[in-house]
Amino acid sequence: MSKLKGKVAVVTGASKGIGAGIAKALAAQGASVVVNYATSKSGADAVVDAIAKAGGTAIAVGGDVSKAADAEHIIDAAIKNYGRLDILVNNSGVYEFSPIEAVTEEQFHRTFNINVLGVILTTQAAVKHLGEGGSIINIGSGASLMTPPNSTVYTATKGALDAITGVLARELGPRKIRVNSINPGMVETEGTHTGGFIGSDFEKALVAQTPLGRIGQVTDIAPVAVFLASDDSHWLTGEHLLASGGLR
């Protein structure tokens, strides 16, 4: 299949987890992919290798999306190596759950810098090159709708991302650039394992409330990104697709 043949995509935070899955899925549909990483070059290289072994095309590019110069560098890598940009997936994100009494200024600024400022800076760099038919996909969270306890800062960033998605859909619509978000529920990734969520009472509570009876997998989210990146979704913009197995 080649829904994205000839297209060029940038996926931020793609060295593992949801970002890695999306990068692989876009490449499998024919896109050339810039696999961005902040610190894990080895992880990004592994994603690039997996794409190459499957017959796809990708490069790994380092950069901190919360820094304007780095955001420009990431986008410029797509132009330098592939000559164009069609798809931007703003996936980079951090999370730390804590009760309100434990929230710190450092936690607030770090989370907002990556989850919100990073999206703005990378999008700012990308729109210089995106043309008619371009697609921006923001990876939000079901947390913005479900507002779980002990997630004040993280959920605030994802609420901001929902708002940014709506604003940019209106702002960029006249240029025929679409902007949508995917809002996953809990997904099994390296991060949710490291954070102690997998196997926890929190996971069990979520599963009990989920109509489809399990937490998500990366392979549940990546096809949604392919849909939003492709012409199959040409009449969708400003949408927030809740990919959570029915949990809301």
Where are the language model's segments positioned?
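A glycine/serine/threonine-rich, flexible loop-to-helix segment
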Residues: 45, 174, 185-210, 220
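Substrate-binding pocket helix/loop in short-chain dehydrogenase/reductase
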Residues: 99-100, 104-109, 206
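Residue(s) in the substrate-gating loop at a strand-loop-helix junction
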Residues: 141
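Conserved glycine-rich cofactor-binding loop
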Residues: 8, 15-17
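C-terminal helical subdomain
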Residues: 181, 201-232, 236, 243-245
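Alpha-helical segment proximal to the catalytic Tyr-Lys
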Residues: 128, 170-174, 234
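Active-site helix of classical SDR
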Residues: 123, 157
